[in-house]
Amino acid sequence: MKTSVLVTVLGLAVISVLCSASQDEEQDMYDELLSAVFEVNDELQSEARCGEKNDRCKTNQDCCSGFRCTKFRRCGRR
């Protein structure tokens, strides 16, 4: 009787630990997914803000990579 109670308690403890570990892994998966989505969103927004050829600019940072701000305040080829 004592042995079966001990085995039952140990079994419940093992199940509890396994369930807790799987919940942590699931939460980590959601956190990684959300951070990846926000990272892609930030990249798209920063790319959308840069100036293409003949877009108005004040500095070279206003133009996309491969372009520079010309003396006419337009993005042009380097």
Curated annotation (Swiss-Prot):
Domains as described in the record: The presence of a 'disulfide through disulfide knot' structurally defines this protein as a knottin.
Cystines in this chain: 50-64, 57-69, 63-75
Similarity comment: Belongs to the neurotoxin 10 (Hwtx-1) family. 64 (Jztx-20) subfamily.
Keyword Acyltransferase: no
Main location: secreted
Protein name per its UniProtKB record: U23-theraphotoxin-Cg1a 1
Top-rank lineage group of the source organism: Eukaryota
Summary of the function given for this chain in its UniProt record: Probable ion channel inhibitor.
Keywords assigned by UniProt, alphabetized: Disulfide bond, Ion channel impairing toxin, Knottin, Secreted, Signal, Toxin
A GO molecular-function annotation: ion channel regulator activity
Subcellular location per the Swiss-Prot or TrEMBL entry: Secreted
One GO cellular component term noted in the UniProt record for this chain: extracellular region
Annotated tissue distribution: Expressed by the venom gland.
